[in-house]
């Protein structure tokens, strides 16, 4: 009888663990299907320039009808501070350098294209940008 009791207790604990892990996945780790669809649209409709760009523009979340997208630049992270991560040959170049200017224009062009693709999707009325701090840190760029 004691053996059956221990076995039942182990099964109960195992079921609780499985349910807890399932809840963590369902409520915290899985990607929102709408966000996944928006990112799939970017992937499918992107020009070769956007598809092959050094930074993966993507939707992070959907707040009602507002798509929040990741970006490597913002007023807090101007282009001159992060351009070297995208184009290592431009690290330390002056912002008026012709190659720097061309790279800045290319960044703006592909970012705008990603935004336009997302805005074309049903249920999205606006795009807001959020600085991709994890990407910047992973590329050795200080946030302060």
Q: Which residues does each predicted region cover?
A:
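Conserved aromatic-histidine-acidic binding/catalytic patches
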Residues: 30, 34, 102
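Short, Lys/Arg-rich N-terminal segment immediately upstream of the first membrane anchor
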Residues: 1-8
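Short, low-complexity, Pro/Ser/Thr/Gly-rich segments in the mature regions of secreted, periplasmic
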Residues: 132-144
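Hydrophobic membrane-insertion alpha-helices, especially the h-region
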Residues: 9-28
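Alpha-helical transmembrane signal-anchor/signal-peptide segments
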Residues: 33-47
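Extracytoplasmic/periplasmic/luminal assembly and interaction segments
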Residues: 44-117
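Short acidic amphipathic segments
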Residues: 56, 114-133
């Amino acid at each position: 009888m004691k053996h059956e009791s221990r076995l039942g207790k182990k099964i109960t604990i195992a079921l609780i663990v499985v349910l807890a892990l399932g809840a963590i996945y369902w409520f915290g780790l899985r990607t929102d299907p709408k966000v996944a669809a928006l990112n799939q649209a970017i992937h499918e409709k992107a020009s070769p320039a956007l598809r092959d760009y050094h930074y993966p523009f993507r939707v992070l979340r959907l707040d009602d009808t507002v798509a929040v997208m990741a970006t490597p630049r913002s007023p807090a992270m101007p282009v001159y501070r992060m351009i070297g991560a995208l184009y290592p040959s431009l690290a330390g170049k002056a912002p008026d350098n012709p190659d720097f200017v061309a790279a800045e224009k290319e960044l703006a062009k592909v970012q705008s294209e990603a935004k336009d693709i997302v805005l074309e999707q049903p249920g999205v009325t606006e795009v807001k940008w959020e600085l991709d701090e994890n990407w910047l840190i992973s590329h050795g760029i200080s946030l302060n």
